[in-house]
C-alpha cells in the first residue's frame, strides 16, 4: 500500500492467501448484529435524494470478476438522506474464478458498528410539536481512477449535521413555523421522489456507462490493508460541505396542501390582506383570506423592530408556543405562523362579532342570564389553561372575542406565563409585571409576584363589569387605581345581584390563597343552574339585550376614588364639607329632547353677593344668607363672579357665559333638589360653606393661562325674582319628582339669566395679555418640611381656591402644589404648551391647558434630575428619558433648583 492506495501489483501471485486474509480481517473488524441490512447498490443515481423510512440499501449483487480477479466496486455518489438505523449489506457470490476461491459473505439482517470509520451510517431523530432536533452522520464510498497510473483509490467521506429548530429564538428564520414530523408527509415525499420513469432510470444508467472505467491489470488485486480513515481536518471540511447539510422539511402542522403531497410552508404571498380590524401597541390585526382555500382568518402582524426595541421578543415567542399547544373551543386557534423581513405573522381563527368590550358598550351591561353563560365559558377556558399550568395574566373584555355563534374565545396570550402544572395555591409564581391596571391583582403590586390566582382576581373584576357595566377599581390615574386595588376599595350599585355579589366578594380577596379554585367557583350558588358544564360550548348563548348600566358611585368615605369635579357638586374646601356623591344621570325618556343636561349640570350652584339687577330667573338651588348675628335671615339669591387669575377673552357665539365660579364669603345653607332619577331623597339639606366649582371645560381663548388681578363685578337679582324663586323652592320641596316640563323650563330660563347677567359685565375687565408669569414657585420643599399639619391644611384649602383649575388633577385632600406654570414642551420638531405642575407627593406632571387633560407624568425616583441648558431651556431626566421644557419668561433656573431640591429631600 502506497499513499493510501491499493496497488494491483502487490497481490498478483498470492491471491489465495490475500483473499483469505481479507476475509479474516473483515470479520475481525466488523461487529455483526441482527436486524440491519446494508446493501451496496450498483445503480448510480447521482442526482436523487431519497427519504426512506426503513432501509438505506447499497447492493453489490453477483459481481463476477472472471478476467482480472478484481472486485468491480460501484458506488452511490448520492446525498442520501435516511432516517432510521437499519442498513443492509449483502455481499453475494463474489467469485474469483481464476484462483478457484469462492468467498460468500451473506451478512443478512446485520447491524454494523462503525468503530473504525468503516462504511457506516447513523442517524437519530427526535421531535415533538414545534421543536425538532436531529443529527446525521454518514460515510459514503467514492471511487477515483487514474488512467495514467492505473490505480484505484478508495476514500471515505463523512458528514455530520446537527440542527435544532425551536420557537425560543426570535432571530431564527423558521421560528414562526409549526414543524410537523408526520410520517405520512415523509412517505408521500418518498413516493413522489421514487416515481421516476423508466426512461429517467435508463438515462442515469446510460450516464454511468458513459463515464470512464478504471483500468484493470492482471497483476492487480485488492490489498488486505484497511482503507485509511479520514483525518480530523478532512472530517471538519466534509462536515461543512453543502451536500451533507441534511435538513428535514419544516412546515406548519396546518401547512399540508390538500392537493399536493409535498409539504408547503406558508408565507405572506399565500394570503390576501383585506382590511385592518384591530390595532395594538406592537402591531395590528387584519382580515385575510387564504388564496388556495378561500378561508377567512385574522392575521396578527407584529413589527420586528419595535418588538426588539421594546424587548418583547420573549413574550412573542411565549404566545406562539402557548397557542400552539392549546386546543379548546373557548380559546382562539392558531393555524400558521411565518415572518418576512419586517413583520411577524400569526394566522388566527377569525371571530366576526368583535370583542366582549364592544358588546358590553352597546348593551350597557348584561342580564344575569347572559353574565352567567359567558362567565361559565370564561371559567371553562381558565380551567383548561390552569390545568396546563398556564396563567393568562391579562384577562379583560378586550381579550375575549365573540365567535360566529356568539361563543366566547379567549385570545391574546402575550402576557401568559407557563407555570408548573397544578400550581394553584402552592405552585410557582411569576415576578414579572404585566396586565392592565384596572384588572391587576394586589399581590403583584405588593409582593411583586403572582400565579394563577391573578386570573381569579381578574375574573372577579370582569364579572363585576359584566353585571354593572363599570369597573370596580377606577381611579383618576394608574397610581390612584393601584391604591384602590391594594385597599380593596369598591362598592356595589343598589340593584346588584346578591348571589353574584357574594361570589365577587370571594374572588376579590386580598389574600390570593383564600380565593376560590376553579372547581369551587363552579360549585358556587351563582352557577347552580348549570348542570352539565361539558355542554356549555354546544349550547346557544342567550341574546344580549340593551340595558341601563348599574353605575357604582363612590362611597362617601373614599379619599382615593375619582370624583367628578363639576359645578353641580363643587369641590371641597375643607374636610367638613359634605357633597353629593351621585352625579345626575340623564333620564332615558323625556318629552323635551332639546335639554342640554351637561349645561344644566354645570350651572346650577348659585352663591351670594349683593348687587341689583332687573332680571328674572328660576333655579334649582336657593341660598339662605345669614344677615346678622341675631339669627334673623333674609332670603336672597345672588350670582357672583369667579375669583380667577385671569378672565376669558371671548365668549360663545350666543354670548352665553360658560364659566361661573362663585366665591363664598359667608356661611350659607344650601338646599339641593336632586332629579327624579336619583336614588337619594329629593330634598337634601347640606349645611356648609358652598365650594367654588371647578371649570369643566375650556376653549382655546379662555381664562386659563391668562394673567389679571381684576375680578368680575358681582350682581344680584330683584326682590321680585327672589320671591319667585322662593315660591318655586317651596313647590319643589313638596314634590319628590320634578317633571320633565319643569326641568325644561328651568334650563331655558337659567340660560336666559346667564346671558343677561354676563352681558352686564364690564368688557374692559377682559385681558388679552400674555400667559401668566412662569414658573410660579408657590412653595419650596424645605419650607414645607418645617410646617405643621394645620399649616399644611390651610395651604391646601387656599390652593383649592387660588389654583382651583388645576386641583382636579391632584389626589383628593392629599397634595400641595409646589410649582405651577405654563411652559412649552418640545418633542422632536413639535412644540406644545403645557402647564407644568410639581406637588409635594412628590409628583411632576403636565397638562394641556386648552383641553384640560393630563398629558403625561414624570416618574419621581432616584433617577430624577434637572439640567438648565439656557435661560429658557431646561431638561428633566427620569428613567433614562429626557423631556425638554422651555420657560417663556426665562426662569428655567427656578424649575431646575426646585426639582433638584425636591429630589434631594425625597431620595437622598
Curated annotation (Swiss-Prot):
Biased composition range(s): Polar residues: 250-262, 696-709
Top-rank EC class of the record's enzyme: transferase
InterPro entries xref list: Kinase-like_dom_sf, PDK1-typ_PH, PDPK1, PH-like_dom_sf, Prot_kinase_dom, Protein_kinase_ATP_BS, Ser/Thr_kinase_AS, Ser_Thr_kinase_AGC
Region called PIF-pocket, residue ranges: 302-346
Active site: 394
EC number: 2.7.11.1
Biased composition (Low complexity): 53-170, 179-189, 200-216, 607-684, 710-741
Pfam families noted in UniProt: PH_3, Pkinase
GO CC field: cytosol
Enzymatic reactions: L-seryl-[protein] + ATP = O-phospho-L-seryl-[protein] + ADP + H(+); L-threonyl-[protein] + ATP = O-phospho-L-threonyl-[protein] + ADP + H(+)
Record domain PH: where: 764-902
Region Disordered, residue ranges: 53-267, 538-560, 606-755
Source organism superkingdom: Eukaryota
Binding-site positions, ATP: 281-283, 300, 349-351, 355, 398, 412
Gene Ontology MF, one: protein serine kinase activity
Start and end residues of each Protein kinase domain: 271-527
Entry comment, domain topic: The PIF-pocket is a small lobe in the catalytic domain required by the enzyme for the binding to the hydrophobic motif of its substrates. It is an allosteric regulatory site that can accommodate small compounds acting as allosteric inhibitors.
Similarity remark: Belongs to the protein kinase superfamily. AGC Ser/Thr protein kinase family. PDPK1 subfamily.
PANTHER family xref list: 3-PHOSPHOINOSITIDE-DEPENDENT PROTEIN KINASE B, SERINE/THREONINE-PROTEIN KINASE
Name assigned to this protein: 3-phosphoinositide-dependent protein kinase B
Source lineage: Eukaryota, Amoebozoa, Evosea, Eumycetozoa, Dictyostelia
Amino acid at each position: 500500500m502506497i499513499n493510501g492506495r491499493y496497488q494491483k501489483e502487490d497481490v498478483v501471485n498470492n491471491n489465495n492467501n490475500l483473499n483469505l486474509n481479507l476475509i479474516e480481517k473483515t470479520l475481525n473488524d466488523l461487529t455483526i448484529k441482527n436486524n440491519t441490512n446494508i446493501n451496496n447498490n450498483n445503480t448510480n443515481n447521482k442526482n436523487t435524494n431519497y427519504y426512506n423510512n426503513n432501509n438505506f440499501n447499497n447492493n453489490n449483487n453477483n459481481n463476477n470478476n472472471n478476467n482480472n480477479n478484481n472486485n468491480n466496486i460501484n458506488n452511490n455518489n448520492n446525498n442520501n438522506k435516511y432516517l432510521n438505523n437499519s442498513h443492509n449489506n449483502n455481499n453475494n457470490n463474489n467469485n474469483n474464478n481464476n484462483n478457484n476461491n469462492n468467498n460468500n459473505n451473506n451478512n443478512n439482517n446485520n447491524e454494523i458498528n462503525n468503530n473504525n470509520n468503516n462504511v457506516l451510517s447513523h442517524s437519530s431523530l427526535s421531535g415533538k410539536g414545534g421543536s425538532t432536533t436531529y443529527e446525521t452522520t454518514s460515510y459514503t464510498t467514492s471511487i477515483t481512477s487514474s488512467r495514467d497510473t492505473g490505480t484505484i483509490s478508495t476514500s471515505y467521506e463523512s458528514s455530520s449535521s446537527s440542527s435544532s429548530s425551536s420557537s425560543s429564538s426570535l432571530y431564527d428564520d423558521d421560528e414562526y413555523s409549526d414543524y410537523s414530523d408526520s410520517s405520512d408527509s415523509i412517505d408521500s415525499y418518498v413516493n413522489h421522489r421514487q416515481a421516476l420513469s423508466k426512461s429517467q432510470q435508463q438515462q442515469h444508467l446510460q450516464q454511468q456507462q458513459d463515464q470512464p472505467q478504471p483500468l484493470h491489470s492482471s497483476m492487480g488485486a485488492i490489498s488486505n490493508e484497511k482503507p485509511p480513515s479520514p483525518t480530523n481536518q478532512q472530517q471538519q471540511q466534509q462536515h461543512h460541505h453543502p451536500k451533507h447539510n441534511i435538513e428535514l422539511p419544516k412546515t406548519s402542522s396546518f401547512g399540508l396542501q390538500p392537493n399536493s403531497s409535498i409539504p408547503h410552508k406558508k408565507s405572506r404571498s399565500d394570503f390576501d390582506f383585506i382590511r385592518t380590524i384591530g390595532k395594538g401597541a406592537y402591531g395590528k390585526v387584519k382580515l385575510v383570506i387564504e388564496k388556495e382555500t378561500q378561508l377567512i382568518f385574522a392575521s396578527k402582524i407584529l413589527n420586528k423592530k419595535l418588538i426588539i426595541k421594546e424587548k418583547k421578543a420573549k413574550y412573542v415567542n411565549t404566545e406562539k408556543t402557548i397557542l400552539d399547544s392549546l386546543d379548546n373551543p373557548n380559546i382562539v386557534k392558531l393555524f400558521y405562523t411565518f415572518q418576512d423581513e419586517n413583520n411577524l405573522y400569526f394566522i388566527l381563527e377569525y371571530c366576526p362579532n368583535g370583542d366582549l368590550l364592544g358588546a358590553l358598550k352597546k348593551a350597557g351591561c348584561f342580564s344575569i342570564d347572559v353574565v352567567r353563560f359567558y362567565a361559565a365559558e370564561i371559567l371553562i377556558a381558565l380551567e383548561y389553561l390552569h390545568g396546563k399550568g398556564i396563567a393568562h395574566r391579562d384577562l379583560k373584555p378586550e381579550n375575549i372575542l365573540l365567535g360566529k355563534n356568539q361563543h366566547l374565545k379567549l385570545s391574546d396570550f402575550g402576557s401568559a406565563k407557563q407555570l408548573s402544572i397544578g400550581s394553584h395555591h402552592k405552585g410557582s409564581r411569576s415576578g414579572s409585571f404585566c396586565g392592565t391596571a384596572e384588572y391587576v391583582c394586589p399581590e403583584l403590586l405588593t409582593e411583586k409576584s403572582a400565579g394563577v390566582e391573578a386570573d381569579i382576581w381578574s375574573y372577579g373584576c370582569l364579572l363585576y363589569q359584566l353585571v354593572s357595566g363599570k369597573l370596580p377599581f377606577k381611579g383618576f390615574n394608574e397610581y390612584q387605581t393601584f391604591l384602590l386595588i391594594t385597599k380593596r376599595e369598591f362598592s356595589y350599585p343598589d340593584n346588584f345581584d346578591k348571589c353574584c355579589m357574594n361570589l365577587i366578594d370571594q374572588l376579590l380577596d386580598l389574600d390570593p390563597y383564600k380565593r376560590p379554585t376553579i372547581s369551587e367557583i363552579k360549585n358556587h350558588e351563582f352557577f347552580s343552574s348549570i348542570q352539565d358544564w361539558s355542554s356549555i360550548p354546544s349550547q346557544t348563548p342567550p341574546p344580549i339585550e340593551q340595558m341601563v348600566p348599574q353605575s357604582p358611585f363612590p362611597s362617601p368615605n373614599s379619599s382615593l376614588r375619582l370624583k367628578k369635579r363639576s359645578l353641580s357638586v363643587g369641590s371641597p374646601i375643607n374636610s367638613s364639607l359634605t357633597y353629593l356623591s351621585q352625579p345626575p344621570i340623564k333620564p332615558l325618556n323625556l318629552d323635551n329632547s332639546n335639554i342640554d343636561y351637561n349645561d344644566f349640570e354645570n350651572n346650577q350652584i348659585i352663591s351670594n353677593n349683593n348687587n341689583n339687577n332687573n332680571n328674572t330667573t328660576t333655579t334649582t338651588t336657593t341660598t339662605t344668607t345669614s344677615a346678622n348675628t341675631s339669627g334673623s335671615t333674609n332670603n336672597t339669591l345672588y350670582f357672583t363672579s369667579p375669583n380667577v387669575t385671569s378672565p376669558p377673552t371671548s365668549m360663545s357665539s350666543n354670548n352665553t357665559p360658560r364659566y361661573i365660579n362663585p366665591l363664598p364669603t359667608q356661611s350659607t345653607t344650601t338646599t339641593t333638589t336632586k332629579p327624579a332619577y336619583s336614588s337619594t331623597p329629593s330634598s337634601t339639606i347640606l349645611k356648609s360653606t358652598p365650594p367654588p366649582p371647578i371649570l369643566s371645560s375650556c376653549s382655546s381663548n379662555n381664562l386659563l393661562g391668562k394673567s389679571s388681578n381684576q375680578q368680575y363685578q358681582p350682581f344680584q337679582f330683584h326682590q321680585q325674582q327672589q320671591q319667585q324663586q322662593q315660591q318655586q323652592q317651596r313647590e319643589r320641596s313638596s314634590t319628590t319628582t320634578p317633571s320633565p316640563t319643569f326641568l325644561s323650563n328651568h334650563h331655558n330660563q337659567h340660560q336666559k339669566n346667564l346671558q343677561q347677567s354676563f352681558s352686564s359685565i364690564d368688557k374692559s375687565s377682559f385681558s388679552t395679555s400674555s400667559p401668566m408669569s412662569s414658573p410660579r414657585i408657590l412653595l419650596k420643599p424645605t419650607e414645607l418640611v418645617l410646617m405643621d399639619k394645620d399649616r399644611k391644611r390651610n395651604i391646601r384649602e387656599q390652593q383649592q381656591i387660588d389654583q382651583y383649575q388645576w386641583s382636579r388633577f391632584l389626589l383628593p385632600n392629599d397634595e400641595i402644589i409646589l410649582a405651577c406654570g405654563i411652559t412649552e414642551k418640545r418633542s422632536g420638531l413639535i412644540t406644545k404648551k403645557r402647564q407644568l405642575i410639581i406637588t409635594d407627593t412628590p409628583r411632576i406632571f403636565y397638562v394641556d391647558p386648552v383641553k384640560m387633560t393630563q398629558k403625561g407624568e414624570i416618574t419621581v425616583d432616584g433617577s430624577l434630575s434637572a439640567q438648565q441648558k439656557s435661560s429658557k431651556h431646561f431638561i428633566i431626566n427620569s428613567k433614562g428619558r429626557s423631556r425638554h421644557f422651555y420657560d417663556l419668561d426665562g426662569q428655567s433656573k427656578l424649575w431646575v433648583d426646585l426639582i433638584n431640591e425636591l429630589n434631594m429631600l425625597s431620595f437622598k
